[in-house]
């Protein structure tokens, strides 16, 4: 039999995918709610790509959502680097929405486009810990500014360097060693 190729669908997954059949247990309302969340995530992915391109080009925004415009315009004004990968190991890395390290200050901005759940600073603290590990910087020797852009506002936070160091050593480094031991056992 000659099966249909569907080249355009390679490396993609349908919402009603056989590989994640949880949806077969949904009622109609749960299906609709789940699909709306999926659509919001897809839109968020596209908005992040759009914002990264605008920042890279230095194109300030007007006429878009207040949250998106604030995030892009602040990132441009503060010379942030969009979509930067922060790497500790194959088991622990992430992609910061916007980051800058100048004048001994680490700034990390995060754009949240979701509808319901407020963003958490813990994610940005992990990015700060990854930055310090990757570039061999003691968090006590720098200033750290974290910002979440969501719900038409920017929430700013300066984490305690001890919290960042604890994340670095007690979580990232220790957990990475544990996972390496698990890999070696197999």
List each model region and its residues.
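Accessory terminal regions of nucleic-acid processing enzymes
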Residues: 176-186
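Mg2+/Mn2+-dependent nuclease catalytic core
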Residues: 84-177
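Metal-dependent nuclease catalytic cores that hydrolyze phosphodiester bonds in DNA/RNA
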Residues: 1-95, 101
